[in-house]
Amino acid sequence: MKKSYRVKKEKDFKALFDAGHSVANRKFVVYCLDRNLPHFRVGLSVSKRLGNAVTRNRVKRRLRHALMDMSSQLENQDFVVIARKGVEDLSYQDIYSNLVHVLKIAKLYKD
């Protein structure tokens, strides 16, 4: 995923948490904020409660891969995906389907 597609700065995360709205399902929480950008930007948050660094990095890699696979269907907004406990045990297909579900609730996923 290119750097231009990532939310990296603390002020951007803070703006998303303060001014954005949130939706959730059992595996993910998504905060989103509409900005006039030519493409989406995403930030990922995986807590230490999910496991050691290897486990957390595996979850982040799978999330990035799923987001790039669905990039043509995503709205041009900033959003942060927060992984909840239990996502570390899911397969890629389960992560993908749960992510699509929560993004549809947030109205970030176009069919």
UniProtKB/Swiss-Prot annotation:
Top-level lineage group: Bacteria
A matching Pfam family: Ribonuclease_P
GO molecular function annotation: 3'-tRNA processing endoribonuclease activity; ribonuclease P activity; tRNA binding
Keyword Nuclease: yes
One annotated GO biological process: tRNA 5'-leader removal
Cellular component, GO annotation: ribonuclease P complex
Alphabetical list of InterPro entries matching this protein: Ribosomal_Su5_D2-typ_SF, Ribsml_uS5_D2-typ_fold_subgr, RNase_P, RNase_P_CS
The reaction(s) this protein catalyses: Endonucleolytic cleavage of RNA, removing 5'-extranucleotides from tRNA precursor
EC number: 3.1.26.5
Keyword Nucleus (UniProt): no
Keyword annotations: Endonuclease, Hydrolase, Nuclease, RNA-binding, tRNA processing
Assembly and binders: Consists of a catalytic RNA component (M1 or rnpB) and a protein subunit.
Function: RNaseP catalyzes the removal of the 5'-leader sequence from pre-tRNA to produce the mature 5'-terminus. It can also cleave other RNA substrates such as 4.5S RNA. The protein component plays an auxiliary but essential role in vivo by binding to the 5'-leader sequence and broadening the substrate specificity of the ribozyme.
Family stated for the protein in its record: Belongs to the RnpA family.
Protein name per the record: Ribonuclease P protein component
Gene label: rnpA
